[in-house]
Amino acid sequence: MENLRQYKADTEHKKVYAWFDNSEKNPASRAQHITSLPDSIDIVGLMYPSELATFEKEEIVTLRQKGTKVAYAINYDEIKTQYEDLISTQPELENESTFDTFLKKEIEKQLAYSEPFDGIILKFIGQNPKYMTVEDKAAYTASQNIFFNTTLDWINKNEGKFLSLQGKPQNVVDKNILSKFLHFIIEMYQVTDKNKFPLAIQDYLETGVPTDRFIMAVSTPSLDASDTSTGYIGKERAIIETAYWITADAQEYDKCGIAINNIQNDYYQTNGNYHNVKETINIMNPAPSK
């Protein structure tokens, strides 16, 4: 256990984030437990943080003893869509609640889930502010400030917890706040050719965006047999191809690790539970040869 904690504390190793679907509150198999995940995962993101079952809270403590952190997401774009859907069905609400009021209330509601967790991953795509009118940019900046300042206020009051950002840091107007994030998780779900990885990252190399903390997000294959594209780059598994790419040095930015979406899909493998995830980790962080 101590060796495991030391390994996690080592800043040099490539980090592994794992998004886990914890919607099942009466688990019928080991696949539905976060304690079944490979020990060398650094950060587990739970997709459903609001009503944790007792067994989940206990398992978070078990993971913490292994040096694994557990987090959840607050998603700016989802909150915006939620507000727009509400206004489209009940237009009279627009007079009572602006988006900014709705946003602040929703963030505060979701921050209340944070007590058992070690950190929060802010999901933010937003829009490119370069092409906005002065009025639109002012409104966009005000909404952003609410989203980020509310969570930064939370982190300042919760020593030892962390914030990461998943999405597009280049669309953040006030780039000064970006230094507060542990990692930027860059979504590579749409990449279909491993040679296009460097191209996909070019958009992120913008003045003011720290380039020393990039994590690449890809998915495991879907459990739906008819879906042959999710989790694949060409014919190969995306997590494996991405791991190999992460091990190759880049001049302009640091590849700090991988984020695996829907990690639980890799549990049942003929050659052992989480076989592909373990291979991914081993490619990035090979066990020292004896």
PLM feature spans:
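Chitinase-like catalytic core of GlcNAc-active glycosidases
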Residues: 11-202, 211-220, 224-227, 271
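Generic recognition of flexible, low-complexity loop/linker segments
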Residues: 5, 32-33, 246
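Generic detector of well-ordered alpha-helical segments enriched in charged/polar residues
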Residues: 5, 100, 104, 275-282
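A conserved mid-domain beta-alpha-beta active-site/ligand-binding segment of alpha/beta enzyme cores
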Residues: 205-207
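Bacterial Sec-dependent N-terminal signal peptides
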Residues: 1-12
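Substrate-binding cleft of secreted/luminal carbohydrate-active enzymes
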Residues: 212-290
